[in-house]
Structure formats: structure tokens, C-alpha cells
Amino acid sequence: MNKTVVRCLLSRSHHPLIHFSTNLSLLHRVFTCSRYLTARFMSTPPPDDMFGFDDPFSPSDSREVVDLTKEYSFLHDSLVDYGNVNVHQVVPIITQSSIDARAIADAVSGVDDVFGRKSQKFLRQFREKLSESLVIEVLRLIARPSAVISFFVWAGRQIGYKHTAPVYNALVDLIVRDDDEKVPEEFLQQIRDDDKEVFGEFLNVLVRKHCRNGSFSIALEELGRLKDFRFRPSRSTYNCLIQAFLKADRLDSASLIHREMSLANLRMDGFTLRCFAYSLCKVGKWREALTLVETENFVPDTVFYTKLISGLCEASLFEEAMDFLNRMRATSCLPNVVTYSTLLCGCLNKKQLGRCKRVLNMMMMEGCYPSPKIFNSLVHAYCTSGDHSYAYKLLKKMVKCGHMPGYVVYNILIGSICGDKDSLNCDLLDLAEKAYSEMLAAGVVLNKINVSSFTRCLCSAGKYEKAFSVIREMIGQGFIPDTSTYSKVLNYLCNASKMELAFLLFEEMKRGGLVADVYTYTIMVDSFCKAGLIEQARKWFNEMREVGCTPNVVTYTALIHAYLKAKKVSYANELFETMLSEGCLPNIVTYSALIDGHCKAGQVEKACQIFERMCGSKDVPDVDMYFKQYDDNSERPNVVTYGALLDGFCKSHRVEEARKLLDAMSMEGCEPNQIVYDALIDGLCKVGKLDEAQEVKTEMSEHGFPATLYTYSSLIDRYFKVKRQDLASKVLSKMLENSCAPNVVIYTEMIDGLCKVGKTDEAYKLMQMMEEKGCQPNVVTYTAMIDGFGMIGKIETCLELLERMGSKGVAPNYVTYRVLIDHCCKNGALDVAHNLLEEMKQTHWPTHTAGYRKVIEGFNKEFIESLGLLDEIGQDDTAPFLSVYRLLIDNLIKAQRLEMALRLLEEVATFSATLVDYSSTYNSLIESLCLANKVETAFQLFSEMTKKGVIPEMQSFCSLIKGLFRNSKISEALLLLDFISHMVCPL
């Protein structure tokens, strides 16, 4: 580049110094400074910082060009000040040699005859100055090819100077511009006529150039011409030809050249011989390679054997490659780290992972350690093959070799384990966690893809707290998660119903300065809606609008659906209007959600009207608000839409209409899916139409849908309800025949059914069997079993089961305590019942129904109803404790344990301001106190009762009057009687 700039500067004048009339010493300082800048701009120093000792002609030099213009702007300014040099150009280096080269080039280029008297006279002054660099520079400055040849010939004639290989190469490069271009005959003739020796060397150089360029045909033609002129190819030419053919995998051609070379009594150099031996081994001819060594009288060294081993690995001759290690040792030529690494990489490239283990152990025993890059490749290979255990061991081997595992290898291992959803198991996840802990200790982070995969695996294994902490730990190590990473982790937590952790992570995300997008907000809104936490979902909905994040149709649909399921139809309609006003049009999912939501809100007729309008009916005015933006070209009902309405019919026991809708689906070309069939079968079972349910099951099978656990569960549950255990057993046998193992729901239904018909021992055996088969009972199973033993009076067994629940990690819920306390009361174990109530309070159960609805999830409606809890659960703001207290107080009154009953009633008053539902309890307790001659206590309770808003029954007044008479308090009795008469018949 410097020479090009020099040429531009000097082409303006015949004399190179015409533009530099200022102080020469100052100019020299400027150019010295610019020389440093030029070196800095053109390349970066080599790794050892020994600038100037790197080979500028090395083909492997791939150093980056670093732009330091800004950093050294002050030096550019100084150049402008002193020399008026353009700061955007690299300042050339002017030397005496450059001046001479320009002078010679101008002289030669300006004349037709270089060998004329005038030219010879001018050039004579430069004879003693001729050198390799000067000649090359002149050749590059001369424009005309003929003049280039003339100067080349003239320079070769001068005493004290002889052309070198770089000069020949420069000449060939100037004459042959294209790789496939031949040298013009006139140029060859000119060189030949002048100096045959130079001509012969020139032809050799020409052959080598075409070999390096891969132009084999031209190289062979030039070789033929060289021979035609009775010149011998040089050793370098033969070596270059052989190397070129070997590089092109033309082993036969290389062999022919070698045979000719041998006939000329020439030997290959060491590099060419190694390449030849490698190529022979690569095609399995390793014996020929050894013969070649003997023929060439070459003494093999470590580099040579390493090359042979590399070729044998390419040929998949691994046993032979291993044998060459022994050959090396036999010749006192020890394998080094390059040898072992070559063998190791060769086995690795051919997927010979078993041999890799053997080679790795051998080389480490001999103190030869693979590089971190090779370790990374090994870990990747073993992870790909599924041997994650050995991949983890390689991390330990890295440490033994002095290499600390870093970012790449940890991400390879953890990413491979967590990236394969199908093969993941507990052992592999434990291994990933172990590697993750070590990675944290080393201060290394996962990339965002592997953070998402790792947290997904942790969530799937139920390790939600660990998944939640991963983000925080990664941030602590310098990892900066983006919105996408947070969204994926939030989605995993929400899908696992870990709403509290999702809430905390979402808030942490916002505190970190990240702005949630519509996708993230929609995940949170949809998940919290499905969990019944509508108020929080609405807060986020409002928040996203405030921060300028426009909700999409999915966001609106999730919230509308939640409002409808919560029977807040007005809120849903208002939100639907907002959606339309914001220009967000409902889609088929929205309308399907409307139908499902209205069904769950008990408005099946409204759902039918929406469905009719979707089908094209215009005479349905009551649902106009939902169809302001709906036209005939909009999407028709799909299988989800049909399924939502069909499920609504079944849940409201309108199974005939559900059956007709199923037929209508098929007529409209909408094929029912598994979910639709299962919903209809469950609906038919619920109303006792078991024969029709079996018919639908048969139809389902004919359409290619095998019975599922849900199908079998519906049938088994109903058969037990109608006390047809024989048919339930047949369904169970059919399940097992179809390799459909019962789950905890089916086992629980069977256990509950057996308990209901008094077969408690059989139910208990079934529960033991399900544990043996690896299906662990849940809280519903234990509660059903406790209820069964309670019905036959085995309270001790019930308590043992409660204790067993704790040891198994199954927490009892409200229904469990309610069932057990009820049976304790019925069997007279009032103290035990009271202790259970205290235990229930101490475990921090919620005080209102809204907080414990999720607690009873999993129990079917019939079971809850059989315990008398259905009405309690349906009333908002009713404390779940109150029913348990009432149950226990009533039984204490019957047992005449009035003091404890009074104390519990006082406790009840702390939970609720109004005790209207306790009217009968108050009246019973007043009557019992009067019968026990505790009239004063009865009057105090009467006073508290009226203050709480509980209206006394006439029986309470009668009990109080009788009690007063028995205690000879006649006047008080008459006053109370007078009060009653005025209350009943006011004046």
C-alpha cells in the first residue's frame, strides 16, 4: 500500500523531492512518525508483542486491521500542521531506494530500447546499488510488460548481482495477471535469447506458480515446455508439483511425478515426503508409505509419525494408528501432545468415542494434556451420544490438565441435558444441577437459551424455588436477562401454578428496568385468570395500557373468559366493548371463550344464542353487542366452539341436546375430537345413562379415538355410584388390557366407591396396591379412606391415616379435617375433635372461603355434597372454621359439656361479626344451660346473642322462663313473659 501512495505522490514530477522543499530534517521527523502510524494502522502486534519479527509474507497471517484513527487523532493533527498531509491517507515512507527505483522506472518506461546508449549511460550509475528489493520495486513501478522484461534482462547481466527466487516470483506475478493465463511467447523468447540459464530458472518458477494456483494443466504444459527446451525441473519444482497434486487428492499423478523425480536422482524434501506419506495412509496404503521412507533414505521423526497417524485416522484404520504409537517408541521417537491430539481428534471425528477414552487416558498418563478446545469437542460429542455422565467426568479431567472449565463447556453440558425433553430424567437433572453449582462457583454464566431450558427442566421436576433462583443467581454473575428470557421462565412457573413465584419474578423484572411486552403481560394475565386471581390479572391489564403496551385479542379473551366463569357478566361485557373500541377484533377463540364462559356462568341459553349467530342466524337480537364487527365471512364454529357448548349442555344435564349437537358437528364437517367425546360420555354418566355412554364410547373408538383415563374415570365413578362394582371391575380390566394404567383419580374413585358400600377393607387394600404400583395417594385419596373408616367407627385408624399423611408429605386440607372431626363427634371422641380443631387453626388455614377454594380442589361435587359442605363453599365470606366449630359445639351440647361449648362459641365470635347461622346453636346452648340450672349464664348468652343480631327462638324464651321459675325468680319470669307478649302483640 505504501508503494502505491508513493507512486501517486511521485507521479506529479520527474523528481521525487519537488513537493518537499521545506526543512528536510523536519520532514524526516514527520515521516518517522507516520511510519509508526502506518505500522499501527496496518496490523496489530503478534501475541508476543515483538513487533517487526513476524513474517509479512506468511499465508497464515490473519491479524485484524485495527482502526486507531480516533485514538491517534492528535498525531494526525500534528501532521497536518507540519506537512499539510491529508489525515485520511497513510503517509508514505520515502527512502533513497524508493527514489532510485522511481528514477530507474521512469527512465526505462520512457524509452523503447532499454539497451540503447543513452539508457545504458543513465542506468550505469545504479549498477552497484542493484539489490533484490530494488529490482522488485522497479519491476512493480514499470508500466509496460516489454519494459519489465528488458529491465529484468539488463539487471541479470550486471556483475555482482544475481536474480533470486523473490525476483522471479515478482516477474511472473507481473507478466501473468490471471491464474490461468500463459506467458506470451515474445516475452519467453526475449528472456531465452538473452540468458538461457535465467530462462530455465524462470520456467521452473512459472511451473511452481501455476501449481500454487491450482492450475495443474497449465503447470504440466509449462513443465513440458521446460523439458522441450532441454531444461531439467528443479527439486523445488518437483516438490511443488507433488504437493499440488496431493492437495487435490490426485495421488496417482503425484506418484508419476515422484517416479520421474527419482529417475532424475532427486529426493523429496521433508515436508513433501510427510504430505505424500499422509496421502498414502489416508487411502489405507500405509505399507507403501513406510517403503517410501526407506526409498528416500529419510529418518522418521515425531512430526512424520504424527502425519501418518493423522492419515490412518482419516482412513478409519484406528488399530493401525494405535500400533504406530508403539513403532514410535521402538525407534526412540516419543509421541508428543500433538501426536496424541491428532489421534484423539481423528477418533473423535469418526465418532470412535470408546477409543477416545482410551487415547485420553494414555496421553494424560504420559503428561500430554489436550487443549480446552479439544475438551469442548469431547464434551459435545459425548453429550450428543447421550453419555452425559462421562461428559461430566471430562470436566474433572480438564481441571487435572490445568484447564478450568469455562463458559463454552458448561453451556454444552447443561444445554445438552436440558435441551432434550424426551430423555430427561431425575439423574440427568441432578447432574445438570451439580454442573450448574460448579459453574456458579467458577463465576461462569449460562446463555439465555440454556437459562430457559434449565428453568423449564427444574419446573417440570417440581423444583420451582430453584428455577426461580436461577435468574437471580445468573444476574449476580453478570448475566443480563432480556424480556424473552423472563417470559419463558414466567410461563414455566405459571403452567405449574406457582403464581406467587411468578408474581415475584415479574415484579423483579420490572424493577430491573426491563419493560414487559404484550407477550409477557398476556402470560401473566391469562395465567392469573385461570388461577381465579382475576383482580390481580385486571391490575396488570390496566398497567399494560398505562405504560403504552396495547393488549391483543389473547389478552382480552383471557380476561373476558375469567369474568364470565366468575359470573361477572357485566364486567365481561364492558371489557368486550373496550376491546372493540380499541380496534381489536374478536376471533374464533374469543367467541369460543364467550360460549364456554356463559355456560360456566349458568347462562347456557345465552351461549346458544351466540353459537346460533356464529352459524349465520340473524334473528337473535339479544347478543348483538358481540357481533358488531362480525360478518358472514368470519370464521365458522370449530371443534373447540362445539366442544364448549356441548360441555355446557352436559354440565347442566341437558345431555339430549348435547347428543344432537354432536350429530350436528359431523353434518357440518367438523369432526369431534377426543375432548368432545369424553365430555359427552361424562355428561351421560352423570345423569345415569350408562348404556348411551357406552354407545358414544364405541362411536369414539370407530372414529380412531381410543378411550382415555378421563373416559374410564367417568364410567368407573358412575358404576360405583350406582353400586355396580362388577361393571366397574370390567372397565378396570379393559383399561389394563389396553395398557392404560389407572391414575390417582381413578384409584380414588374406586376407593371412595368401595367405602360408600361398606367395603372399607377392600378399599384399603386397593390403596396399598396403588402405592406398590408407584401411584402415590393424594389428599383426596386419604380423605376418602378416612371417611370410609370413620363410617364404620374406626377412629383410631382414621387418626393413623392422618399421621401417615404427614409422614408421606401429603398435607391434609379443610375437607380432611372436616370429615375427621365429624366422625370423631359422631363417635363421642369430642376431645380428639377439639384437638384436631386446634391443630387446624395452628396450621394457618385461611379464615374465608375465597382463600380456601383451591384447598378443596380435586374432590367431586357428590363427595362434598355428602359432607354437607356444598352450601358452605358456595357462600362468599363464610369462614370455613365456623361450620367445624358449629359441628363440635352442637356435639358438646349434646354431651352436656357446656363450658367447653361456651368457650368455643366465644372463639367463633372472634372470626365473624355476625353469627346468624348459629341461631340454632345459641338456642340449644341456652336451653341446655337452663336445664343445668345455669340461668345467669344463659341470660348472659341471651344478651350476647341479641347483640350479634341473632334472633332468639320462642323455645329459648320458654327455656329461660322455666329456668327462672325453677330458681324461684318469679318476678323476673313474669317480666320476661310480659316482654314476650309485647314483642309478639305490640300495642
Swiss-Prot record:
Organism phylogeny: Eukaryota, Viridiplantae, Streptophyta, Embryophyta, Tracheophyta
Residue ranges of the TM segments: none
Keyword Membrane listed: no
Taxonomic source organism: Arabidopsis thaliana (Mouse-ear cress)
Assigned GO CC terms: mitochondrion
A Pfam family annotated for this UniProt entry: PPR
Name listed for the protein in its UniProt record: Pentatricopeptide repeat-containing protein At1g06710, mitochondrial
Gene3D superfamilies: Tetratricopeptide repeat domain
Keywords associated with the record: Mitochondrion, Repeat, Transit peptide
PANTHER family named among the record's database cross-references: PENTATRICOPEPTIDE REPEAT-CONTAINING PROTEIN 4, MITOCHONDRIAL-RELATED, RESPIRATORY COMPLEX I CHAPERONE (CIA84), PUTATIVE (AFU_ORTHOLOGUE AFUA_2G06020)-RELATED
Organelle transit peptide residues: 1-42
InterPro entries: Pentatricopeptide_rpt, TPR-like_helical_dom_sf
Keyword Iron: no
Disulfide bonds listed in the record: none
Compartments in which it is found: Mitochondrion
Family as reported in the entry's similarity comment: Belongs to the PPR family. P subfamily.
NCBIfam families: PPR
Major subcellular location class: mitochondrion
PPR repeats: 164-198, 199-233, 234-268, 269-299, 301-335, 336-370, 371-405, 406-446, 447-481, 482-516, 517-551, 552-586, 587-621, 638-672, 673-707, 708-742, 743-777, 778-812, 813-847, 881-915, 918-952, 953-987
Coiled-coil stretches noted in the UniProt entry, renumbered to this chain: none
